[in-house]
Amino acid sequence: MKKRCLALLLTLVLCIGMAIPAGASQFQDVPDGHWASDAVDYVVEKGLFNGTSATTFSPDSGMTRAMLTVVLYRYAGSPAVTGTVASETPFQDIPEGAYYEDAVVWAYQNDIFPDWIVSQDGGDHNRTTFAPDSPTPRMDFAQMLYQFSLYLTGEAPAEAGEELPFVDVTQEALYQVLAAAYPYYLSDEADVAQIQAAVSWAYTQGIMNGTSATTLSPDRTITRAQVAVMLMRFDGAYGEVLLQQAVLALVNEARAQEGLAPLTLAQNLTQAAQVRAGELPVLFSHTRPDGRSCFTALAEAGVAYRTAGENIAAGYATPEAVVDGWLHSEGHRANILNEDFTQMGVGHVQAADGYGDYWVQLFVG
């Protein structure tokens, strides 16, 4: 059995940043103690959306369909899109060069939108009006986040398996909500089930709260503050998945430039890589803290392989930075561009030390 454990990055990057003052000093309408202040700081620092002025965030203002589409597109890393609105979507009310143009193409191509946004009648007739400035109901954003989680993970979120305490998300209530919000759309049981699955997932995952003990207000326009809070909570559940996908995309981009086949992200490899990442703050080495080889983590995760490699790094704050660091190190680059490797796992942890971020790539073939 061939096993390789290549050299560490010789220069570790020490990430020391200046803290940006939190919401109170930045936005006068989101003072310290505001229920969404931490979330507002989060979305602004992450670059998902900005204030409505230099000193205001407008937390209670509603979010339009175009705004929310752009926010999710940015969260996904603003991936390159192929085609245009005219060539890839049925929508005819989006001017060329609109700030949300690429976001709409991406969302349409990846099934982020609920059916009632893209279908005229609930059947095969496409809707030609996107209505970018229309306010977005809470149920629509829950549905878009649900679809976004599917986009990130490649699998539908697990069903909640518990009855919600809200009287306004019953089948009868949602039929009425859909009919009032989208009178052109002929909803059926499948549409109602979609909403129920999305809001149930969002509620049980702690992403969305009710507006009272017995109501979720699915038809109420979602506010900027509510979106900020939901995205911060979503990131707590799915943020690592997005980092893993970003590392994979960058690795495959480098492999494509060399004419190599892309790697796939394997769940059991990622499980092993995550274990290894958790060990690096204790011992930054290809040897585990208990003295065993790094590759014993593969066996523990049930990974079968003929050849394997590991890259590790510390101090890089983003997927782009760490992959660039690996690609500029001969041994790590050799792993990334190894034609014998077919699968990869990615691990990442943050530690309260000078390096902050610890990364692991595990490769097998």
Model-derived regions, located:
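Phosphate/pyrophosphate-binding loop motifs in nucleotide- or prenyl diphosphate-using proteins
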Residues: G47, D111, G206
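Tandem repeat domain/solenoid detector
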Residues: E45-G47, R224
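Feature responds to low-complexity, polar/acidic, surface-exposed segments characteristic
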Residues: C5-S37, N50-T69, Y73-A103, P114-M139, ...
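Functional surface patches built around histidine and acidic residues
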Residues: M232-G365
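A short amphipathic alpha-helical interaction element
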Residues: V40-V43, L72, A107, L145, ...
